[in-house]
């Protein structure tokens, strides 16, 4: 079994929209993920999130408040077949863009990432977002409406 993995995620909201990675899982539909990824040995969460945003957005961010902690125990969810031995703990932080998003400066897009997109918060539930439960954790103005620990949700 794999060790438990720490992952950091960016919540970037501006003008009633949230910035998410646009992804193609080869299933015929567009999906969206929060920018971020795994913490490396010797990195703080803040350092990891700044690195991940540079890799995936080509942008520098400032990292603010920790607002959610989510567990993902793969065997409990829809991707159990491929993620059965995965246990990841994700830490979601409010972030602000310090530079503009520029994918030509992105250094390491995720394999399934085909771009980024600003999605209207008032229509967030209309999109395929992973984890979908996170769309339920904020209102249409981006205000956090859930406790910090959201559990093993997808």
Regions found by a protein language model. Give the residues of each.
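Active-site-adjacent beta-strand/loop module that shapes the phosphate/pyrophosphate-binding cleft
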Residues: 74-104, 137
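N-terminal strand-loop-strand
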Residues: 1-34, 61
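A generic structural micro-feature
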Residues: 2, 31, 81-89, 108-113
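The catalytic Nudix box helix
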Residues: 34-35, 39-68, 78
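Internal catalytic or translocation cores that form aromatic/hydrophobic pockets or channels
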Residues: 46, 50-51, 71-72, 88-89, ...
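Short, charged/polar surface micro-motifs in flexible loops or helix N-caps
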Residues: 13-18, 28, 40-41, 69-75, ...
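NUDIX/MutT-family hydrolases
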Residues: 105-138
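Charged phosphate-binding loop/patch that engages nucleotide di/tri-phosphates or the phosphate backbone
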Residues: 130-154
């Amino acid at each position: 079994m794999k060790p438990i993995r720490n992952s950091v995620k960016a919540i970037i909201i501006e003008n009633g929209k949230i910035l998410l990675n646009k992804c193609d899982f080869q299933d015929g539909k567009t999906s969206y993920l929060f920018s971020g990824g795994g913490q490396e040995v010797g990195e703080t969460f803040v350092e990891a999130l700044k690195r991940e945003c540079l890799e995936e957005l080509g942008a520098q961010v400032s990292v603010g408040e920790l607002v959610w902690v989510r567990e993902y125990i793969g065997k409990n969810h829809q991707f159990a077949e491929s993620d059965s031995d995965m246990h990841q703990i994700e830490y979601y932080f409010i972030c602000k863009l310090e530079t503009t998003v520029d994918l030509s400066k992105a250094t390491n897009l995720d394999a399934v990432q085909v771009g980024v997109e600003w999605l209207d918060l008032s229509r967030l539930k209309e999109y395929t977002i992973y984890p979908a439960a996170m769309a339920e954790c904020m209102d249409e103005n981006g205000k956090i409406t859930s406790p910090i620990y959201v559990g093993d949700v997808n």
